[in-house]
């Protein structure tokens, strides 16, 4: 007997409920026009990398725990003397999530991490890029449950970019609201 294939909770919710809600709201001519999540990119820049070259590796380990996937170490493209950065010097880590891992991360972000952010008043509804992608920043990476607070020697911020197939910001905003993103009023 074949086992049932695992499907993330938010993906199931998208297929069963969110697609229908988006179709009713925007009345698309074709079912393929309904926007969906494409990918989530998480970037963690480590400014202290100029002083200690081990910092990006530690940040990458934390990012791997958060994302559930090994990140790539980002390197400086060119030298900037003012920042004491040399070309090819490791300066951060980033990871691109797609498929099931993307939906799992989104579920943890919206339901666990964002409510744990200090003085959180909602996400800025203007943080869209004009092409249906949403960007946000988190100042402390310890809001994620995978990070053990006692073992953290330094806190890093991170940028989270949610890429959708929506063509306008209004469509993307409606899609993310259906995914329970807590936008500011």
UniProtKB/Swiss-Prot annotation:
The gene is rplE. Belongs to the universal ribosomal protein uL5 family. The lineage of its organism: Bacteria, Pseudomonadati, Pseudomonadota, Alphaproteobacteria, Hyphomicrobiales. GO terms for molecular function: rRNA binding; structural constituent of ribosome; tRNA binding. HAMAP family: Ribosomal_uL5_B (MF_01333_B). The keyword tRNA-binding applies. Gene3D superfamilies: 3.30.1440.10. This is one of the proteins that bind and probably mediate the attachment of the 5S RNA into the large ribosomal subunit, where it forms part of the central protuberance. In the 70S ribosome it contacts protein S13 of the 30S subunit (bridge B1b), connecting the 2 subunits; this bridge is implicated in subunit movement. Contacts the P site tRNA; the 5S rRNA and some of its associated proteins might help stabilize positioning of ribosome-bound tRNAs. This is Large ribosomal subunit protein uL5. Keywords: Ribonucleoprotein, Ribosomal protein, RNA-binding, rRNA-binding, tRNA-binding. InterPro entries: Ribosomal_uL5, Ribosomal_uL5_bac-type, Ribosomal_uL5_C, Ribosomal_uL5_CS, Ribosomal_uL5_dom_sf, Ribosomal_uL5_N. It comes from Rhizobium etli (strain CIAT 652). GO terms for cellular component: ribonucleoprotein complex; ribosome.
């Amino acid at each position: 007997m074949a086992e049932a294939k695992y499907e993330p909770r938010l993906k199931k919710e998208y297929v069963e409920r969110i697609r229908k809600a988006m179709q009713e709201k925007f009345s698309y001519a074709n079912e393929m026009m309904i926007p969906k999540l494409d990918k989530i990119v998480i970037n963690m820049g480590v400014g202290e990398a100029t002083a200690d070259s081990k910092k990006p590796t530690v940040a990458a380990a934390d990012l791997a725990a958060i994302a559930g996937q090994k990140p790539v170490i980002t390197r400086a493209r060119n030298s900037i003397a003012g920042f004491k950065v040399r070309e090819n010097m490791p300066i951060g880590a980033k990871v691109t999530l797609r498929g099931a891992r993307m939906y799992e991360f989104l579920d943890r972000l919206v339901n666990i991490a964002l409510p744990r952010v200090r003085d959180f008043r909602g996400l800025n509804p203007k943080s869209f890029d004009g092409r249906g992608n949403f960007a946000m920043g988190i100042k402390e990476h310890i809001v994620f449950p995978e990070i053990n607070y006692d073992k953290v020697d330094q806190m890093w911020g991170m940028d989270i970019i949610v890429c959708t197939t929506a063509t306008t910001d209004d469509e993307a905003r409606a899609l993310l609201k259906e995914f329970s993103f807590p936008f500011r009023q």
